[in-house]
From Swiss-Prot:
HAMAP family: PyrE. Orotate binds at S130. Belongs to the purine/pyrimidine phosphoribosyltransferase family. PyrE subfamily. One of its GO terms (molecular function) is orotate phosphoribosyltransferase activity. Homodimer. Interacts with BrxC. Pfam families: Pribosyltran (PF00156). This is Orotate phosphoribosyltransferase. Keywords: Glycosyltransferase, Magnesium, Pyrimidine biosynthesis, Transferase. The keyword Magnesium applies. Catalyzes the transfer of a ribosyl phosphate group from 5-phosphoribose 1-diphosphate to orotate, leading to the formation of orotidine monophosphate (OMP). One of its GO terms (biological process) is pyrimidine nucleobase biosynthetic process. Its EC number is 2.4.2.10. 5-phospho-alpha-D-ribose 1-diphosphate binds at R100, K104, H106, E126, D127, L128, I129, S130, T131, G132, G133, S134.
Amino acid sequence: MGGNQILKQIIAKHLLDIQAVFLRPNEPFTWASGILSPIYCDNRLTLSFPEVRNDVASGISKLVKEHFPEAEMIAGTATAGIPHAALAADHLNLPMCYVRSKPKAHGKGNQIEGAVQEGQKTVVIEDLISTGGSVLEACAALQAAGCEVLGVVSIFTYGLPKAEEAFAKAELPYYSLTDYDTLTEVALENGNIHSDDLKKLQTWKRNPESKDWFKK
């Protein structure tokens, strides 16, 4: 088993153990978009557990060094990506900035906070990737400011087809500490879910906008 797969399993177990991720295949959550989802993820909880927080920061730093060794700046997405970007930037001894979802309505009207420079090679840190829309908007804001965005690193990704398409269209790579497939496998091994639940979870991922998975 490769090092990255071991890391994926460690982070997945952390997220389950601290209940940053809930799996409810029989009592789905409703997302703001109206999608019925068997999973709810709140990676902000990782900040409250020092061991988990350190493993996340170390893991993000490892992925940045491995995939983006030329990085000159770490950018966090507001608000959930900011603390993880700060911790990773500290590990890597790199400058850090953060990107709001839209410019401030007062003051200087900044969307990007921090000292960014033209051509600065930047990696964007996000806590969670679902469709990829919000983090790609942050990438676009950085590009508009003159940064060279190398790619994105996140704690967790659902691995949804819509996200894969969005990143391919933006011509940006992304890497995650762990993912939906790894997490559901770890959940099954740990007894968090049963084999019938796993089938439902796999069906949802293939087409999250359909409610057919819930009827199975």
